Amino acid sequence: MTPQPSGAPTVQVTRETERSFPRASEDEVTCPTSAPPSPTRTRGNCAEAEEGGCRGAPRKLRARRGGRSRPKSELALSKQRRSRRKKANDRERNRMHNLNSALDALRGVLPTFPDDAKLTKIETLRFAHNYIWALTQTLRIADHSLYALEPPAPHCGELGSPGGSPGDWGSLYSPVSQAGSLSPAASLEERPGLLGATFSACLSPGSLAFSDFL
């Protein structure tokens, strides 16, 4: 057998491969040559776009929206401040109304000399304090005088000052604290002249002026 040249089989193989596998078009050949974009590059591009152009548009929109919403927010704040101020004024008005009503009711039970005397708020409170103190001292004197042979009738100046120490207030007359003592109503029924004389000596307009209670 004669040796065949080395180039012949290679030509046949290449022709057979060309027949079995048709040649791809130029477009199909060029597509695979271009490498697919890596995910890291796409992420990097998106990040750069967000840093650059993607963030520019929202900033402009925010600036426009912020400029338009400023008057609305200021208007809402002013309305809210007005409503709060109105509520605070209403609360203060109601508080003063209740206080004035209570002071008027207190003035109605306090004896005044003359009757048409108009007391201020602080004068009403001081007069009520001193008047309650005088009544308490009178009841204490009447209660202690029931068991004495000769009931003393001390002068009102010896009773002490209404603005004394808190210990003086603790020693005042109390129907519950003193066992066996008669109630003020029983004292008045048994000895009606005793309390009247003591009370008139301490609270009569002739002995004490109205300014002494203020």
Curated annotation (Swiss-Prot):
Keywords, in A-Z order: Activator, Developmental protein, Differentiation, Disease variant, DNA-binding, Neurogenesis, Nucleus, Transcription, Transcription regulation
PROSITE patterns the UniProt entry points to: BHLH
What Gene Ontology cellular-component terms does the record carry? chromatin; nucleus
Q: Which GO terms describe its molecular function?
A: chromatin DNA binding; DNA-binding transcription activator activity, RNA polymerase II-specific; DNA-binding transcription factor activity, RNA polymerase II-specific; DNA-binding transcription repressor activity, RNA polymerase II-specific; E-box binding; protein dimerization activity; RNA polymerase II cis-regulatory region sequence-specific DNA binding
What's the chief localization of this chain? nucleus
Instruction: Report any one BP term from Gene Ontology.
Output: central nervous system development
Positions with biased composition (Polar residues): 1-14
Segments of skewed composition (Basic and acidic residues):
15-26
The bHLH domain extends over: 83-135
Subcellular localization = Nucleus
Stated consequence of mutating R93L: In DIAR4; attenuated NEUROG3 function in vivo
Q: Which SMART domains match?
A: HLH
Disordered as annotated region, ranges:
1-98
Q: Where is the composition biased (Basic residues)?
A: 57-70, 79-88
Q: What does this protein do?
A: Acts as a transcriptional regulator. Together with NKX2-2, initiates transcriptional activation of NEUROD1. Involved in neurogenesis. Also required for the specification of a common precursor of the 4 pancreatic endocrine cell types.
Kindly identify the disorder that the protein's record connects it with: Diarrhea 4, malabsorptive, congenital: A disease characterized by severe, life-threatening watery diarrhea associated with generalized malabsorption and a paucity of enteroendocrine cells.
Assembly with partners or alone: Efficient DNA binding requires dimerization with another bHLH protein. Interacts with ATOH8.
**What is the protein named?**
Neurogenin-3
Q: Which organism is it from?
A: Homo sapiens (Human)
